Amino acid sequence: MKVLIVEDDGDMRRLLKIVLAGMDVETEEAPDGESAIHSLETSSDPDLVLLDLHLPYTSGEEVFEAIRKHSKSAIVIVTADILAAPEFVSKADGVFTKPFKTNELIIKLTSLLAAHKKDMQGEQ
């Protein structure tokens, strides 16, 4: 399983990577929206994208739309401002408000990754 972490805050990216390390998943990081879209265009699709909405260069909203248009990846929004883009929050597969409880994030991500894996196997 592969997870793309799209987060401009380096400390938050490291924390998310540490959380995911215990879940036996491959991670890729993008510090901004432009890097995230480049990664989506040049790498195999991630199973899950952890997406901050407030990003430099290309907004999280634009990244969200690009993912939905070109990928079947699950999207979990991780943001400090839940009210910033309610239309995207309602379309996401999950939402976590910073700061979040690590154990709750692990439970949700485990569930989403299992469901995504099952969906992908059903399509084969």
For each predicted feature, which ranges?
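Conserved acidic carboxylate
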Residues: 7, 79
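Two-component/phosphorelay signaling modules centered on CheY-like receiver
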Residues: 10-28
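Acidic, metal-coordinating helix/loop segments flanking the phosphotransfer/catalytic sites
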Residues: 29-48
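Acidic catalytic/metal-coordinating carboxylates
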Residues: 32, 59-62
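Active-site residues of response regulator receiver
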Residues: 52
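Short amphipathic alpha-helix used as the core "switch/output" element in two-component signaling
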Residues: 61-72
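Alpha4 helix (beta4-alpha4-beta5 surface) of REC/receiver domains from two-component response regulators
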Residues: 62, 80-97, 103
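C-terminal output helix
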Residues: 100-113, 117
